[in-house]
């Protein structure tokens, strides 16, 4: 009985303080995050590390939603940085296979994105230079990896679903992350390895199956009422 009372008190405490929960680090919508990134670059506060949090494979997303990448490519500042912005990483085994067939220094034609989840986004055509290849990298579950120049953005593409938090993934492809101005990782909160590099970091509220704003996800069998969908609901432990 004492244990049950403790559980009830804890549950009631969570409920009573629900409006106080928030992200613990800098969190922004996509367009705002890109604007702030350009401010940081201009001020020399680099590297800036952005978390593509809505498509976080370590939380169960598909690692192939390209919507945020498309915004970056369309930005004339962020798509022309030197050294280039590095985006780590997209799951697309067909594109990786094509990159290995083309070889380093050559051009690969194909599509990027929506290799697994064709609902959250759609593929974009790419005509990309193959900058570097890495076969069966042990740090990413022996995934093959390719570094592609996609319209001025260095994009890491993997043959397997992998966690995108380790800067060693970039180093395996010849990229020195400490020297970059902007890094984007498909991740939520930054892991210590990548956080140690960042001079400024932002969690970006991007699209995907791990969208941090739960009300933006589609639910088919959600019992109602349910918080935060029904803000005015009442509940008692």
List PLM regions with ranges.
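Extended hydrophobic packing segments that form well-structured cores
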Residues: 15-18, 135-237
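Hard-cation-handling environments
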Residues: 1-152, 156-157
């Amino acid at each position: 009985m004492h244990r049950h009372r403790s559980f009830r008190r804890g549950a009631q405490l969570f409920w009573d303080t629900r409006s106080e929960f928030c992200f613990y680090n800098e969190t922004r919508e996509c367009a705002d995050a890109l604007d702030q990134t350009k401010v940081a670059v201009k001020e020399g506060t680099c590297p800036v590390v952005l978390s593509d949090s809505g498509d976080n494979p370590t939380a169960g997303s598909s690692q192939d939603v390209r919507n945020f990448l498309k915004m970056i490519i369309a930005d004339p500042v962020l798509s022309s940085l030197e050294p280039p912005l590095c985006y780590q990483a997209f799951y697309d085994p067909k594109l990786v296979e094509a990159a290995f067939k083309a070889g380093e220094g050559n051009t690969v034609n194909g599509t990027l994105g929506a290799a697994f989840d064709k609902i959250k986004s759609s593929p974009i055509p790419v005509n990309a230079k193959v900058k570097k290849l890495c076969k069966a990298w042990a740090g990413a579950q022996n995934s093959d990896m390719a570094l592609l120049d996609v319209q001025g953005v260095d994009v890491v593409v993997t043959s397997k679903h992998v966690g995108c938090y380790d800067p060693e993934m970039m180093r395996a492809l010849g990229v020195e992350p400490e020297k970059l101005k902007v890094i984007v990782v498909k991740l939520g909160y930054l892991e210590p390895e990548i956080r140690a590099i960042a001079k400024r970091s932002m969690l970006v509220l991007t699209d995907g199956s791990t969208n941090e704003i739960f009300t933006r996800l589609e639910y088919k069998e959600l019992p109602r009422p349910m918080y935060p969908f029904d803000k005015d609901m009442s509940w008692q432990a």
